[in-house]
Structures are given as structure tokens and as C-alpha cells.
């Protein structure tokens, strides 16, 4: 089977972590490129010659697409649209991608009338407008698939996404729906809840193992705990929240997951400045540090990271998402047992932050 080119949408900045997961789960996948759609998405292009279904198990991605057409250098003029219409109507690559999508839908018992929807995202300055781009795509589809019906809702059988990023054009057919990015049903969410794909990326960076004693001491709605459960077995799963209300709802969210309830899961009402765990009793920590006034964070960070250094086992690992980079670096300089290995700048809910991997020496 010839390798097919796919692309994954991620939250901006998560694309490097998403590729690490793709490479681990799909050993024969080959990296093609990574792109950045302003502050909307990261994009990872890769080739893979296996069945499509295993792609749906990826966790650090928001959406997955079959690549139908790709141009490295467009003219930014009207010629682009004439060429796009022609290639949609005539090029075998587009037909092959549609056939693969239809086969995948049949295998998954998806059926329905041949409807389609166009999603266009344009970043840069061009002679044509986004609406002109949409009309060019529609013209090509009508020429090739005259029986297809254009619809405006989210229930089209075929979603054609066209991204123009500077001089790069990528046309993809969507394989997934909203359930990939909004995968958890929660009893209650709080405003600071991170997206599941970001939580999954953080969990991947912890290098999950069945012997883990895993802690999220500031678990919010419990998203990191839920993603750790999805990553496989662990010896103990521990969560903490500052208020009894948050602890209660995070506990409900984790326990209502469809997978068998873990006998080793415990939720604590705790303060991140004084963790109720023995020295060197935990080997993995992942958490999203709160944002807020600098004075409050300047009191929290030193005490919290002193506790992380205390409870982590030697060679343990902490994966921390925070927005106060300078404060974190200053505090870690005061903890000689903690070493920052690397970091990834990401954005979530229109706010930039950084995921740090911290090693306990």
C-alpha cells in the first residue's frame, strides 16, 4: 500500500508533542512538515501506509485530515483559483482521497446522502477573497461530483478544509468530528479547564508507565487525571484541589469515565503549598499552575516547587504548564534537585503558556 499523507490539527505549539505521540503510536509514520495557522492551530503533516482507524486513538491532536491537494508555492493571484478548480475536477490525487474517505466511512457504518461542506482559512494577503476561494472549490466539486449537495451545517458527509498559509495551500478531507477535541463529558467544568488535547500532550511528556504513582495537585476539573487514565494503567492515581467543591466535581468527572473505575484513584482537598504525601513517594507529577496576580503566584511558586522537590522520587518527572516563565525559572534556581529538561510554548484559550519538563535529580 502506498503511503497516504495526513495532517493533524493541534493547539498552537503542541505540534511537536503531537508528532512525538504519532511516532510512538505509529512506528512507520514519516514526518513531512509542520505549519502554524496563526493562533488557531498547529499543523503536523505526516505519511502513513496503514489503516486509518489507529489514527483515531491519537490524543494530542484536535482533528485529523486526509491530504487531498497540496501546493508548496502559490502565486497569491487569480491563477491559484483556476488551478485549484482544475485539480479538484481532474487530479487523481483528489479522487483517491475521496475514495479513501468513503471507504473509511463505510467501514465505520457511516452513510448518508452525498453532501459536502467547505471550510476555508486564509492567512495572508491575496488578490482573491476567501469567498472567491470557496467558489473555486465549489466549481471543481460540481464538475467532478455533480450529484453532491453543498450544505452549510456541521453534518455534511464530506468536509473539505482548505488552508492558505502564506505561499502554502493544503486541502484536506476531515476524518474526525468534534468528539475528538471535546472527548469528555464532565459533571462540571471550571473556567481554567485545559483542553483535553493539551492535557494529553502533557501526559505523553510524563512518559506513562504502569508503575507510576501519578499526582495532579491542582487538578481543576480533572482533565489531566482523565487523560492519565486513558494513557494506561498506573499504580496510583492521585488528584488534589484547593476547595472541597472543586475536589468533589473533579472526583465525579474521573469516576464517571466509561472505562472501569480505578481502585487506586484518590482525590484530596489540599493546598499546593503543603502536599500531604511522604518524601520521595511520587514519581510523576503533571499540573496546570493557576494564573492570577503576580503577588499571589510569587507566594505559591516557591512553596509548591519545594514540595515537588520533596515528594518526587529521584529520576521522577514533573510536567508543568504555566504562564509566568521568569518566576518559574527564578524559583527553580532555588531548588538544586530540580532540573528543567526542555519546554514547549503553547497557546490555549488565547493565552500563551509554556509546558516545562522538570527532572528530579
Describe the predicted segments one by one:
Residues 44, 168-169:
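Hydrophobic residues embedded in beta-strands of well-ordered beta-sheets
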